[in-house]
Each structure stands twice: as structure tokens, then as C-alpha cells.
Swiss-Prot record:
Protein name (Swiss-Prot/TrEMBL): GMP synthase [glutamine-hydrolyzing] subunit A
Pfam families (alphabetical): GATase
Top enzyme category: ligase
MF-aspect GO terms: ATP binding; GMP synthase activity
GO cellular component, one term: cytosol
Active site: 73, 161, 163
Domain of life the protein comes from: Archaea
EC numbers: 6.3.5.2
Name of the gene: guaAA
Function: Catalyzes the synthesis of GMP from XMP.
Keywords from the UniProt entry: ATP-binding, Glutamine amidotransferase, GMP biosynthesis, Ligase, Nucleotide-binding, Purine biosynthesis
Matches recorded under PANTHER family: GMP SYNTHASE [GLUTAMINE-HYDROLYZING], GMP SYNTHASE-RELATED
Pathway: Purine metabolism; GMP biosynthesis; GMP from XMP (L-Gln route): step 1/1
The organism of origin for this protein: Haloarcula marismortui (strain ATCC 43049 / DSM 3752 / JCM 8966 / VKM B-1809) (Halobacterium marismortui)
């Protein structure tokens, strides 16, 4: 069975990320972002959202664990920041029901949602420039980089919240991430 660790960056929806995966039958644990990297033993990691880029604990070190990573909201921003992208304030802050245009129908995480999906967004900051090796895989009228992927490293990010009921195809995002984790697990054996 696929094992996923959800890393708690103290976001308002983190418990919903854990619950969504648990309800899908996944062996999932919620781990504080101060957990030492050597204690992480999972087939994949979800970096949760959170309120503060200055309170990301050991998240940068988790990016080196050679397992697939899905960053959600702040989780995506910290991936971009740590790996050479650029994060800044968004022009539109707050909560919103947003139509997101999926740019790559072959993307392992979001391709199945092509050409667009409705999502729930809740953020003030956003990725302004993706890191080297990443592709922008989704955009919207309110955020230029709604998602990004580095398929070679199996590191993905979405600016919105797939764990929230208002996101129409959120469970599919998690299902696609689980598929990536399963494929990577087989490849490592």
C-alpha cells in the first residue's frame, strides 16, 4: 500500500489533505514540518499550505528525499523558492472560486483535467517564476502560475487547494499523485 506523509505547515486545510487521502484508502500520516528528514519513510510527500514562508521547518530538506512531492499553496511556493524560482505577492489575494486552464494534457498530475477545472484558491503570495527544470502546467486570470511540474524529479505544485470540497476535481489530483508515487516506488525497487 502506498504510504504518504502530509507535512503540516500549519495551514487551515491541512487536516483535509490528510482526510482526503485517508478516505481514498491511503496509508497517510500527518507529520509536523520539524520532523527530522531521516524519520520520513514514505512513498510520497505532500507539503501542505500554511500562513508563513518563514515557518517551513525542514521542508527544504524533504525535497532531497528522492520520493515524489506535491506542494499545495505554500508548499508549492516553498518548492519554487528553494529550487531557484521566484515567489512574490499576488495581485489578487484572498479566497476565490477560480477557473484554471490546464496547459499540458500529458502532465502526470494535471493532464487528466485538461482543458480546465474549477478550484478553490486561498493565497496572498504566488509563484512568479518557476524554478529551472519545471514547467508551468496551469494558469488562470488571477494567478499566472497555478501549477508547476518537474516530471524528471517527480516534484509538483498546485497553488490551489485540491483537498477542499469546492475544488471540483481535487480527488483526481490526489489520485494522479498516488499514481506517480506508485510508479516511482516500482522504479526504485
Amino acid at each position: 500500500m502506498t504510504r504518504i506523509d502530509v507535512i503540516d505547515n500549519h495551514g487551515q486545510f491541512t487536516h483535509l489533505e490528510q482526510r482526503a487521502l485517508r478516505d481514498m484508502g491511503v496509508d497517510v500520516s500527518l507529520r509536523d514540518n520539524t520532523t527530522p528528514p531521516e524519520e520520513i519513510d514514505a512513498d510520497g510527500i505532500v507539503l501542505s499550505g500554511g500562513p508563513d514562508m518563514d515557518d517551513i521547518g525542514n521542508c527544504p530538506e524533504y525535497l532531497d528525499l528522492d520520493v515524489p512531492v506535491l506542494g499545495i499553496c505554500l508548499g508549492m511556493q516553498l518548492i519554487a523558492d528553494e529550487l531557484g524560482g521566484r515567489v512574490g505577492g499576488g495581485e489578487y489575494g484572498g479566497y476565490a472560486d477560480v477557473t484554471v486552464d490546464i496547459l499540458d494534457d500529458d502532465d502526470p498530475l494535471l493532464g487528466s483535467l485538461y482543458p480546465e477545472t474549477r478550484v478553490w484558491a486561498s493565497h496572498a503570495d504566488e509563484v512568479k517564476e518557476v524554478p529551472p527544470g519545471f514547467e508551468r502546467t496551469a494558469t488562470s486570470d488571477v494567478c499566472g502560475v497555478e501549477a508547476m511540474s518537474n516530471t524528471d524529479e517527480a516534484i509538483y505544485g498546485v497553488q490551489w487547494h485540491p483537498e477542499v470540497a469546492h475544488t471540483e476535481e481535487g480527488e483526481e489530483v490526489f489520485e494522479n499523485f498516488l499514481s506517480v508515487c506508485d510508479q516511482q516506488s516500482v522504479a526504485r525497487q
